[in-house]
Amino acid sequence: MQTEHVILLNAQGVPTGTLEKYAAHTADTLLHLAFSSWLFNAKGQLLVTRRALSKKAWPGVWTNSVCGHPQLGESNEDAVIRRCRYELGVEITPPESIYPDFRYRATDPNGIVENEVCPVFAARTTSALQINDDEVMDYQWCDLADVLHGIDATPWAFSPWMVMQAANSEARKLLSAFAQHN
């Protein structure tokens, strides 16, 4: 895969430039555009993934299915499709917006900061997973209710963005509705 970049944003969310992805994530990460996706199977189960230990931020942490950064000229939806192919080896249904105005800042235990405007999407797949070990070290298909209960009971066991997304009542309601429509 070619070198990825992030689209830098000002405080109003207007693009101001780009920066190489690895260089962008530091202790002083600038605000940039990202996306987060929750992927469901035909049974309505959520794919929860564990980030590879080689990841710069939050290595080994359990999180939602796929996250990434749209590239210049690429829609968020196309970026979700691209990253699902790259990380999971799957084709998906057109991504549906779940939490379009999600924005967060969090610092991992190593001091790496995520600072993102990060619209959240949900999609489905019926494909068999072909996991990219550079991105994902483990995964599990789970009932959404069990995952949400786990997040509520042990938020420290999940990525901060997943916890924050699940804490939004409207996003939680939309994810639950999405999971039930098999």
UniProtKB/Swiss-Prot annotation:
Nudix hydrolase domain residues are 30-164
Main location per UniProt? cytoplasm
Top-level taxon in the UniProt lineage: Bacteria
Entries under Pfam families matching the protein: NUDIX (PF00293)
Q: Does the keyword Magnesium apply?
A: yes
In this chain, Mn(2+) is annotated as bound at H25, H32, H69, E114, E116
Which key words are in the record? Answer: Cytoplasm, Isomerase, Isoprene biosynthesis, Magnesium, Manganese, Metal-binding
What does this chain do?
A: Catalyzes the 1,3-allylic rearrangement of the homoallylic substrate isopentenyl (IPP) to its highly electrophilic allylic isomer, dimethylallyl diphosphate (DMAPP).
The name this protein goes by in its record: Isopentenyl-diphosphate Delta-isomerase
Q: Which organism is it from?
A: Escherichia coli (strain SMS-3-5 / SECEC)
